[in-house]
Amino acid sequence: MKRTFQPSTIKRARTHGFRARMATKNGRAVLSRRRAKGRARLAV
């Protein structure tokens, strides 16, 4: 059985990156929640 986690920086950024979050209304909600919580890193 192959390992399921095959890291790729590009895929990571495209699905969980800042610009990906900003692209949708819900993504912006995620960022605002993380800002409110005081996260050092908002997105990947």
From Swiss-Prot:
GO molecular function terms listed in the Swiss-Prot or TrEMBL record: structural constituent of ribosome
Superkingdom as given in the UniProt entry: Bacteria
GO terms (BP aspect): translation
Alphabetical UniProt keywords: Ribonucleoprotein, Ribosomal protein
Signal peptide: none
Cellular component aspect of the GO annotation: ribonucleoprotein complex; ribosome
Family label: Belongs to the bacterial ribosomal protein bL34 family.
The protein's name in its UniProt record: Large ribosomal subunit protein bL34
